[in-house]
Amino acid sequence: MFASISPYYGVSFFEFFIVFFSRLFSGKLFYDHLYIDDIQVIVFFAIAVSCSIIGTFLVLKKMAMYANVVSHTILFGLVCACLFTHQLTHLSMQNLTIAAISTTLLTGASIHFIRNVFKVAEEASTALVFSLLFSASLLLLVFLTRNAHVGTELVIGNADALAKTDIFPVFLVLLXNLGVSYCFFSSFICVSFDTVFAFSLGIRVKLIDYLMMFLLSASIVGAFKAVGVLMSLAFLLVPGLIAKLIASSVQEMMGYSMIFGVLSALIAPALSRSILSVHGIGLSTSGLAVCLLLVFYIGTLATVFVRRHILLQSKN
């Protein structure tokens, strides 16, 4: 019955955008009249913008590996929260946020502890903490939540299960990212490029690092239901990596990062719906979004390479 009343039922790729924007500009896109396709676009849009903001600074600070570790180890905190609260399928945003922030701080503290006490390289301590916490989370998922669906949803997400109640949390995370980044924008830039120089200017480097970790964990929590803990890494890093190839300033980099993230967020639901309508095949919307980001990155990388090759040939 839901399909028969949905305006997106049976539409093609371009018809999807016609229906969506006609509903948007005609005022029919009210909270009480949202369909699953509308919710996917809105939630994916908020996730893309939110992750692009903090992702830009993570790429500039060369914290891609740390973000990768956190996106995996945070699964440990989420599973522990499920077990302690005895809620294997539904967790409140408050519990998720506390679990994510706690695991992020635990990851960072463990890396620094192993590096300083055992005098090993940071890469080695990072790999050790990553392997330990992620393997522990997988063991908990296999042995303690075998009869629940929490494992699949935490890892790869379930965009088709999004509801209206999921809109508020992701926009709350977006507002937090926008607010903190606006207030500490210059400090974020200084710390991202040179921590010694930032410290000489009187910037509290550790405070900025903790703020970045807070925004990182909040962004992952905001994205985990739609795209999963692991796939959220793509939204955090890939748009920033694409923007870094073509931008000449931090502002441009953040702008390009948002553009590519939003494009992926808009195209993925439309592509998923059109494939289902035309071919009758249901594909993961979050998986399509990540694949689109990969295509954008490869295309941008190839374009930059060709342009540089042409410039070198013209000079010779």
Swiss-Prot record:
Gene3D superfamilies in UniProt: ABC transporter involved in vitamin B12 uptake, BtuC
Membrane topology, record value: Multi-pass membrane protein
GO biological process, one term: transmembrane transport
Coiled coil: none
Disulfide bonds: none
GO terms under cellular component: ATP-binding cassette (ABC) transporter complex
Family annotation (InterPro entries): ABC_BtuC-like (IPR037294), ABC_TroCD (IPR001626)
Subcellular location: Cell inner membrane
A Pfam family recorded for this sequence: ABC-3
Ranges annotated as spanning the membrane: 1-21, 39-59, 64-84, 94-114, 124-144, 171-191, 196-216, 226-246, 252-272, 286-306
Record keywords, A-Z: Cell inner membrane, Cell membrane, Membrane, Transmembrane, Transmembrane helix, Transport
Keyword Cell membrane: yes
Assigned protein family: Belongs to the ABC-3 integral membrane protein family.
Record's function text: Part of an ATP-driven transport system TC_0338/TC_0339/TC_0341/TC_0342 for a metal.
Alphabetical list of PANTHER family matching this protein: ABC-TRANSPORTER METAL-BINDING PROTEIN, METAL TRANSPORT SYSTEM MEMBRANE PROTEIN CT_070-RELATED
Protein name listed in UniProt: Probable metal transport system membrane protein TC_0342
Organism: Chlamydia muridarum (strain MoPn / Nigg)
